[in-house]
């Protein structure tokens, strides 16, 4: 998670996929405390390698942080998503994720064949409001964001991959264009 927060996404993804490829019992699909490093044996029902609640919950926590996390007074969406998850025709959807600022839902629809993506965000405000909501969109071919529309209006608060949405609204309809 530290790598994700520091913007070192390649390292973060290496950790994420490493937990899947090495840290799971092949016949149980749950993480375990350890494997035998020399033989690679990972019999999931051996007393020291039983399903390990801490490791499994850590994998869930990392997945959650890849999709949504809070940084001080901001909500950050999709900051840890691999480019492959945003290939043409794919979608990412998060429903009612709990934050300090109330539940947040969002959906990203990729249409990168036409160099665009569509994002909807719903934030059920509670007594506290985030300063901003940031959405990170990593184009599979590395193309930068060139134009953004928020709720049908031109929007200028964006960088190469990150769109910064204003606080105080509950619904956002965002069209993002790449070139």
Identify the meaning behind each predicted range.
Residues 2, 9-179:
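Non-catalytic C-terminal accessory modules of carbohydrate-active enzymes
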